[in-house]
Amino acid sequence: MADPVLLHSRTVQQPRATINKLHILFHLTAILLLLYYRTTTLFYENNVPTLSWSLVTVSELFMAFIWFLGQGFRWLPISRSVFPEKSPSDVRLPGIDVFVCTADSKKEPTVEVMNTVISALALDYPPEKLSVYLSDDGGSFITLYAIKEAHEFAKSWIPFCRKYGIKTRCPEAYFSLLAEDERLLWSDLFKVEEENIKSKYEIFKKNVENVGAKDENNCPRMDRPPCVEILHDNREDEENKIPMLVYVSRERRPSYPHRFKAGALNALLRVSGIISNAPYLLVLDCDMYCNDPTSARQAMCFHLDPRMSRSLAFVQYPQIFYNVSKNDIYDSQARTTYTTKWQGMDGLRGPLLSGTGFYLKRNALFGSPNQEDKYLLHPEKNFGNSTKLIASLKSNHNIQDASIKDENSSVSILEDAKLLASCAYEANTNWGKEIGFSYECMLESTFTGYLLHCKGWTSVYLYPKRPCFMGCTTVDMKDAMVQLMKWSSELIKLGLSKFSPLTYGVSRMSILQSMCYGCFTLQPLLSVALLLYAIVPQLCLINGTALYPKVSSPWFGVFSVVFLSSLCQHLYEILSTGATFMTFWNEQRMWFIKSVSGSLFGCLDAIMKRIGIQKANLRLTNKAVDKEKLEKYEKGIFNFQGAAMFTVPLIILVILNLVCFFGGLRRVILENNIEVMFGQVFLSSFHLLLSYPILQGLIPSKRKRN
């Protein structure tokens, strides 16, 4: 039997992998020595400040534990390449259903959402095998109006992109500076057609913005029936085919749980199951447009590889943001995650599901590898009582041709689709439990991906040179902190639940993979350790109480090695990914600032939910662009407007460190004991350096008020 065509390659990152392992051994040795010093001094030395020493020791112990869990990311980092030119012919390619989710047209600009939809329609994939579904959880008039307008514009835009091989197929991005190179050196005919297309886009954009300007058209409807409309079903315009386009607004009733994004995705799973029933799904956030039309073909290089496709659940792409400033003062690009951690997990069982930009096997949501039919033994109990949905699950082929042959069958399918999008359909079924996206955690994609790995599925991570998906990130402290608080709260909830990676996960996946998940879920608790580390040594400094060895002591060298080793490892990862020292410093200070603010409030939020003081609610990040915020962000000025709650612990720590630093320094000079107190003087000064952006962000705003 001939060997299968090589569709992709896998390379271990060397010398990075070897350096990482050597550093783990070195750093672990230093940490063990440090903890040995702490514990022996506490139990065997006299005149030790027991409470302060114990608090600092516990902080260092927990930081060491989180560091140890994080080494799973560094054990086997790999890179992947794909060869889409070797992929099967269009006839043999499987179908793909694209899911785009939006919830609030006020916080998620409608034109931006439509650009994402249009870019998905324009993917370089056989149009008869591609279907795009928009989930509108707000049920607002403007979204339905806009998608109809987008459909009309797409009839001109998609043929134009195909004719000239346009790569940037999001119209807003194409007509901006992001795609300026694509518009050079073209013929006069191209320029004429481009101007015509641009004119149509401006008309489309203006129409949507004019309708959206009326508040009543933007108001989400929280009590409404389901609405499903097939805007394009591939039966017309054979010459310039465009993919199927479907609008879905699931039913909302105050008496039924909402289930947020997970509920929307499960509704799309059911509705698409009786309309197109593609074996693979692409899930996109409403602001994450398709930047490379070949992303689907690249993903199929893995899904169609017979050596791995049996157990492969999804292909994850990184989230790349087009509006990240040069300095990236808020660490919005999440460089560590997408250039270090995900590549490390890819060397194990694969990265976790990141919420957007992933190609997922539909059957993976319905069972374990080689046991996808398990839940079909009792289909009504698991999937509900829709005969069409159950039939689609049992079939191994795309049922689109059988579903929409004539107007009567189309009407019948729409009625069934509305039933599947109703609130009551999931009652007494396993949707959100063992079927579909999980309702256990509001980080629905992350938790669902975790469960997939626990069931035996694998995933891969692809970081191509040209970003396949691009989106808009937060440009002020408030939105960054609100987002972090939501993530931290849900991660802590997961880390301390019965599904904890260190208990539930470790028995179902490799130890290293469990360590990675454990690091993610427990990392928000670092906020407590860092808070203690930013308070206790400083108070002891001003009181003249030493918590660290003398500079002349060999044990001081151990503390220095741990500190410098950690910084050097971070700096090495920064430089090896092509970033600069400024990126290193920004990540250091934002790690501290976010930990003692957003993550800290996330922990408090999780506690309040646990004891019933606060209910779970969806906190949408505002994706509407504020020019003033954007200007400050691009200039590298921290903007704390609207983030008063998050700045309280930061300001308290800054004031405490200032008082303790200068008060302690005065005492050190008077008592001439710098050798004894140097560790705390240095620690306090380092905290002040990390906290400088807080003063930098607050002082200009005061000047502006004056």
Where are the model-predicted features located?
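Glycosyltransferases that elongate glycans
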Residues: 1-459, 469-474, 481, 485-706
